[in-house]
């Protein structure tokens, strides 16, 4: 079930168009992204690195830099401990290279997803002490590790936490909230309530990018040297699904510009392994091609493989490593498809598909892909989904949510069910014992206040734009709005009453449908639909009947008109350009 909404934000779109030399349509698209002032729009369209916030505003960044400077100058050993996803690997890379530039004696460890689980733990701390490490810096983890940090302190280690995740909290009997910060020598996280940094929604890699800038300032190193990390910080921002607004937009835009001629040999090899060297790389390539290759190592082997690729400078070795990661990602895709199929079968067979919050138990699923499966299931059912699998220590799970359900807060209400948990409003991870599974499902659903309205997929349309209005110049102008992603989605347009003149299935898999459409005034346009063509045809039959559907497929006259949402594009084939639309709904 879907509900379509057309944005109705008001402004003088002609005036905005005149100021920025753009069409009123593009002006409307900017207003739909909650931009109200000329300054905001100027920064959105043409923001540069000079518009980024002062790194020194991050609470404890200066304090942490002073500590690290003293450790470097006295020859102390430093160890980085990161997460194993794209943001964790990227954070580790930036921190390692930045500390090396400052002369640090530094190494790194990345927790094994299966053996160690998420984040810093007692074993990693003990190993650091055994190895003669003086200082541990966490990145993309540590904010929820108060006990582990305290244990490190007891062993005489210096610990610095850099993270971007939500601060753990407890709700008191009087309704007030108390936050539980780790007792590290410095805690650098923009989500701290007393942190003056103006924008809290940055990823772990951007946090350490900012920290390295502060460190460079302290060492008298030109901070422009830190710009070599921008393409890595940009990739992490997209892959960690940070909102692509404010300074994140600038970082990603600049990173995409630089990646076309990156000096990071391993990253260039990964681009070539995925046959992207001749393409203009976009946020899509970060999120759906390059990022998943880096993630695949942390999921199926070791995230060290991905980090070693980024650190490697030998072209042939980089080529081998990049091809291995690309192949690993192909295996991950197949495992995911099998897992999604099993998850749907589980829900239907248990009768839990009707629950408000879906809890799927797949004991034999590889724990590393539980989050991906949860995401696919959320898209299919449009409900919050937890996918849980069995491990040596008990159960581990990942959750993905919908807008109406704050996953982390809901889990915090039943924290007695977990051994460990953490996350965001839209995603979470946890571990628990098997005898808690049914209690977990029951309590989540008992507490859930979700309604059928919350489960309806909400389709937000930017503009009802007739196909007759489309032109190549207008479509090219929409590129000003890139990069697209979370909170800066690709614009969605709508057209009512399109007549289907014909259609045909393309490709061997049948997953692509080409339609030939026209409006009431006779304007014709080609359209592509990249969903399940058989599902599309089934819905067509259910809507208009088998006989009428067959007439449509054969290109015969009929009485069916279709409403669509779409994004326009300029298609080039054998030197010829034509405008087509890609149907979304």
Where are these regions (language model features)?
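Catalytic domains of riboflavin
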Residues: 1-3
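Hydrophobic helix-and-loop "lid/oligomerization" segment in the mid-to-C-terminal part
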Residues: 7-135, 154-156, 173-175, 183, ...
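Mid-to-C-terminal polyanion-binding domains and interfaces
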Residues: 70-74, 315-361, 413-585
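Conserved beta-strand positions in the Rossmann-like core of class I SAM-dependent methyltransferases
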Residues: 107, 160, 540
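Active-site cavity-forming subdomains of large catalytic enzyme subunits
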Residues: 126-205, 209-218, 228, 245
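Histidine-centered active-site/metal-ligand motif
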Residues: 164-165, 366, 424, 512
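Short, well-ordered strand-loop elements centered on a beta-strand within folded domains, enriched
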Residues: 176-179, 185-187, 393-401, 524-528, ...
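Short alpha-helical basic/polar micro-motif
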Residues: 206, 371, 375, 564
